């Protein structure tokens, strides 16, 4: 069945597209002047369509973010940003440094090559009229050629500018087994030694996978564990919120070669080589969502209970021959690992004590290659703690993504605040520099299905000015986590004047939906209440000072670019 449809209301356009991409049998003589005329008309039409703009719908919902918008090629074909296929169509893709691109969804596999018309769709070699191309550092692919392979239809109407991507049949079906190692999407196994740094090894190993195989970087564990701002020594351990806070505040990551592990020293002056702008915290024991994250986004950091401490340890819960671990007791979590794959058919008989059914996650450990299967092992789906907390780092950008970050919550999400109901308002006030425009804000969703509206108030003098707010963005987060929201339109900020960013947040089932930084215990002794001006409100009309009345900072950052 043909699964992509062209809706073209102007017959001349249809004829032009046909003439430019398909030859009849026999010999057709065309002189250079004819070819130039056809090419010129195609380019002009493509330019007109792109200038008018295309509206993208995926499964009936409009995709409003500009970063996902397609464009019309000079051959009058749709070119779609590769990341849209991952983020909106739940495909997985890998870009290799040699230009090869592999895109998968369900059983379909499309193999393309950057700047080449040679392709392989479901094992068959084909020629495509438009080669994948890099444009403004983004990879675009000819979607109508591969939509069928990915179980999607592609309908577009040149007259209205509407592009519709609609899945065919069931939701994405994950394979029964998947292993990031086979896809070249993991970095080397490392050894934490006798320090309590598993949490940082897991966080950074997961972070590294989000870049692979296009970029292969190794990040510094010493820098994360010794420069995070928390009052914790390396031997004392840590957890994922510390990792997110360190990364979200742009303290890191830095490269391992610039701050090597195990030398008992660090360099706090190093600059982050990447900027984390988003991390998803997946629902408790949502195994399907964890698999989808591994398949489409990157390795997933999770925590387990382990009575082993290194590669030389043994445990009644660990089968050394099969490298299989299953714990069904009541002890709490004490060790972080990274999920890099799964096998639904991994036999329950591989474990010392058989869980109720087959199935296991493939996990990367931080005890060196002498442990397990070259540093990896299998954890049963039915382990007491696997996937209770699952973190995937989903938006890691270059260190030049914004010119400036405004923040007062360098320790990140320490606690929560609210008014005993699921929604609330919170705001942060900052003083702009010269010639700046506000591009984005970031904050935490403390649980799944959180909705938000983001507002901006310029020329702030007191809380009365918060009533003069302008709506600049809205949306929903599927999972808890840390998110950066791009504004619908940039906001020019008055030079050296105060401005306020305001969020109305709704978290179903929550009584305290606002993430805050405060002095909770000895770990947060470095908390600085003097560096922020935050406010909270129930209805957005009466505001309370976060610092003066609640002794906290609200977690709400702002990102700007220079205009000159």
PLM regions: where:
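Short, low-complexity patches enriched in S/T/P/G
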Residues: 1-3
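Noncatalytic modules at the cell exterior or secretory-pathway interfaces
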Residues: 491-503
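Extracellular/oxidizing-compartment recognition motifs
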Residues: 85, 146, 471-474, 553
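Short strand-edge motifs at loop-to-beta-strand transitions and within beta-strands
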Residues: 481-483
């Amino acid at each position: 069945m043909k699964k992509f449809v062209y809706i073209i209301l102007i017959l001349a356009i249809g004829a032009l597209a046909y003439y430019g991409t398909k030859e009849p049998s026999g010999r057709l003589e065309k002189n250079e002047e004819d070819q130039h005329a056809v090419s010129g008309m195609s380019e002009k039409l493509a330019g007109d369509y792109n200038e008018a703009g295309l509206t993208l719908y995926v499964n009936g919902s409009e995709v409003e973010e500009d970063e996902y918008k397609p464009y019309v090629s000079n051959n009058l074909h749709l070119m779609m940003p590769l990341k849209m296929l991952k983020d909106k169509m739940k495909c997985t893709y890998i870009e290799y440094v040699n230009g090869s691109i592999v895109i998968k969804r369900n059983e379909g596999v499309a193999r393309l090559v950057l700047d080449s018309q040679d392709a392989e769709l479901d094992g068959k070699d084909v020629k495509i009229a438009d080669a994948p191309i890099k444009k403004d550092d983004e990879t675009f692919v000819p979607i109508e050629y591969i939509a069928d392979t990915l179980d999607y239809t592609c309908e577009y109407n040149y007259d209205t500018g509407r592009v519709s991507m609609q899945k065919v049949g069931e939701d994405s079906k994950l394979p029964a087994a998947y292993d990031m190692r086979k896809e070249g999407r993991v970095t080397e196994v490392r050894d934490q030694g006798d320090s309590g740094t598993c949490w940082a090894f897991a966080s950074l190993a997961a972070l590294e996978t989000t870049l692979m195989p296009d970029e292969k970087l190794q990040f510094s564990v010493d820098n994360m564990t010794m420069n995070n701002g928390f009052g914790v020594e390396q031997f004392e351990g840590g957890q994922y919120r510390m990792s997110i806070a360190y990364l979200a505040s742009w303290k890191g990551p830095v490269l391992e070669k610039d701050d090597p592990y195990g030398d008992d020293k660090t360099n706090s002056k190093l600059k982050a080589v990447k900027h984390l702008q988003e991390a998803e915290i997946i629902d408790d024991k949502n195994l399907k969502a964890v698999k989808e994250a591994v398949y489409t986004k990157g390795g997933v950091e999770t925590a387990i209970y382990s009575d082993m401490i290194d590669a030389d340890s043994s445990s009644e819960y660990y089968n050394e021959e099969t490298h299989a671990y299953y714990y069904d007791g009541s002890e709490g979590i004490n060790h972080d690992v990274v999920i890099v794959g799964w096998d639904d058919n991994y036999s329950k008989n591989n474990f010392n004590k058989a869980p109720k059914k087959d199935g296991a996650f493939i996990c990367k450990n931080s005890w060196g290659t002498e442990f397990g299967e070259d540093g990896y092992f299998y954890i049963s789906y039915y382990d007491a703690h696997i996937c209770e907390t699952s973190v995937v780092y989903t938006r890691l950008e270059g260190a030049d993504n914004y010119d400036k970050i405004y923040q007062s919550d360098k320790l990140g999400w320490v606690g929560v605040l609210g008014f005993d109901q699921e929604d609330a308002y919170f705001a942060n006030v900052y003083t702009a520099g010269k010639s700046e425009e506000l591009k984005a804000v970031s904050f935490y969703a403390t649980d799944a299905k959180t909705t938000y509206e983001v507002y901006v108030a310029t020329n702030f003098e007191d809380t009365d000015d918060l009533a003069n707010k302008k709506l600049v963005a809205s949306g929903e987060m599927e999972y808890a986590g840390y998110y950066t929201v791009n504004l619908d339109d940039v906001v020019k900020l008055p030079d050296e004047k105060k401005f306020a960013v305001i969020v109305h947040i709704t978290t179903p089932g929550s009584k305290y939906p606002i993430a805050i930084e405060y002095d909770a215990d000895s770990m947060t002794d470095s908390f600085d209440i003097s560096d922020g001006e935050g406010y909270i409100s129930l209805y957005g009309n009466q505001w309370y000072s976060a610092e003066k009345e609640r002794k906290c900072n609200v977690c709400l950052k702002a990102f700007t670019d220079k205009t000159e």
